[in-house]
Amino acid sequence: MIKGTQSAQRHSFEGVNLGGWLVLERWMTPTLFKGTDAQDEYSFMKTKIGASRIEEHRNTFIVEADWKWLADHAVAYVRLPVGYWALQDDAPYKNVTTQLDWAFAMAEKYKIHILLDLHALKGSQNGTTHSGKIGLVEWRRYEQDSLDAIKQLALRYRDSSALWGIEIINEPRIIGNYIALLRYYHDAYTVLRGVLRPGTYTVFQDGFVPLLFSGALWQRKKYPILMDTHFYLVFPKLLSKLTPEKYDRIRKVLYSGAILLTSWRQPLIVGEWSSVLPREMLHNKPKAEEYAMLGATIERQRRMYHRAIGRFYWNYKTEGLGMYNYRSLVETGTINT
C-alpha cells in the first residue's frame, strides 16, 4: 500500500492503471500514432504500419523493469485494461495473449495483484477512443461476444495467484442502456461464478452514476462483488478560477458524499482518479510550486477516497511527463511512496 493518510492506510489500498498498453489511447502514446490519421486502435490497425508498430509497442511500453519499479515502490495492485480481442484476433484487432500471459508471470514474480479490466467491448460500450473504436455504441448487438471474452479470460487466469478480480465493462454509456446493463451485469456475474475461484472479485461499473447502480448486483456467498466508480471533475471556466483548495472542496462534496451514500450498500473501488487540475490554475507557476499543488491535491483526494476498498491512479505512465504520469510524479517527489 502506498503511504497516504493513516485512515486511508487502514481502510483501503492504492494501485495504478496500466492504461495505454494493451488498449491504445492516442493521447497517451502520440508517437505511436505519428504519421497516421488514426484516432483509435481500430483505425490504427487498419493502417499499413499498424501491425508492426503495435507489436513493438506492446513489447516495450511495459517491461520487467516496470514491474520491479512498482514492487520497489510498494504498489501491490494494478488495473490492467484489455479489449475483447485479448485472447483471440478479430480483424483488425490482434490478440495480446503473449503479453497478457507475461504480465501475469511478472505479477506473480513481484507479488502484484491484477484487476483484469475488460476496457473495450465489441461494438463499443461508449463510442470513445478507449473502447477501441470511436463512433456508434453497439455493444448490445454483441453481448454474447463480451460474455465469451470474460469467460475465456477467467478460464485462462483463474488459477494465477495474481488474479485479484475481473472487471466486466468500463465506463458504459448509460442513456438508453440502463436495463440492458443490469441484465449484462447479472449474466456476466453468473458466468464468472461458474469459472472463478471463490474469493476472486467480480467488478462492475457505475457509468459515472454511482447512486443509480449501487446494489445493482447482489453478492452470492464466496463470490465477492465490487462497484467501480471513476472520479473526473469536468473543468468549466468557473471552476478553473478557483484555488486548488476550493476546487478540492467541491470534489469532496461530490465524491466523498457519493462514496458515503453508496458504500454501506455496495462496496466499491475508485478505478480511476488522478491529480489533474485545470491548466489555468497552473499557468505561469514555477515547476516547484506546480508540483507542490499537485502533491497537495493528491493527498486531499486520498483522504476523500478512504471509504473505498481501493483506488487506482490513472495512469502508471504516459509517453510524456505530467499529471497523468504516476511514475514521473513519484520520481519528482510529488507523490510520496
PLM ranges: what are they?
Residues 55-78, 88, 92-120, 130-165, ...:
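An active-site-proximal structural segment forming one wall of the substrate-binding cleft
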Residues 26-39, 92-95, 123-141, 329-330:
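Aromatic- and acidic-residue-enriched segments that line the glycan-binding/catalytic groove
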